[in-house]
A protein has these predicted regions:
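Non-catalytic terminal extensions that flank enzyme cores
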Residues: 8, 12-15, 90-91
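N-terminal strand-loop-strand
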Residues: 15-62, 75
Length: 156
């Protein structure tokens, strides 16, 4: 089946309506991208975490992540934040979207924050270190997460 699509021509009335939409105010909010990176290290299934070095959530363990820049996709932001916060310069290739978290007031900052979470399984990529707003980066065995460590990612 062949489908022909005719492009929309913007008439003056359509353009005027679009200008009106651009002027409409919307509540401010931020979009972040987080990434859960899993690997096998020392014969154990492990997750890459950071310790927050700044408020909010100072000292808490979290997934690497941060706010999107205006010129990047959520996937690009996840890759950039991974490098900035863990010094892990890996070509992830395919990121799988895990979930989007958008509950109002899930983040204590002034504006609403919506988070797109991704995950990836990679080969053991070696040691990591904290950078930018991460005090440190560490590999944590997943079986220890279930028992001893609580990862803070905000109420969802």
């Amino acid at each position: 089946m062949i489908v022909s699509v005719t492009p929309i021509e913007y008439t003056p009335s359509v353009t005027t309506n679009l200008e009106h939409l651009e002027k409409k105010s919307h509540p401010p909010f931020g979009v972040t991208a987080d990434i859960a990176v899993f690997t096998i290290r020392d014969e154990r299934f492990q997750l890459l975490l950071i310790e927050r070095g700044e408020i909010p959530f100072l000292g808490r363990l979290a997934l690497p992540g941060g706010f999107l820049h205006p010129d990047e996709s959520a996937e690009q932001a996840a890759q950039r934040e991974l490098l900035e916060e863990t010094a892990l310069d890996a070509d992830i290739g395919h990121l799988e979207q895990l979930r989007t978290y958008s509950t109002p007031d899930r983040d204590p900052r002034e504006n609403r924050v919506v988070t797109v979470a991704f995950w990836a399984i990679l080969p053991d990529l070696g040691e990591v270190r904290g950078g930018t707003d991460a005090a440190r980066a560490l590999w944590v065995p997943v079986d220890e997460l279930e028992n001893d460590i609580k990862v803070y990612s905000g109420p969802h």
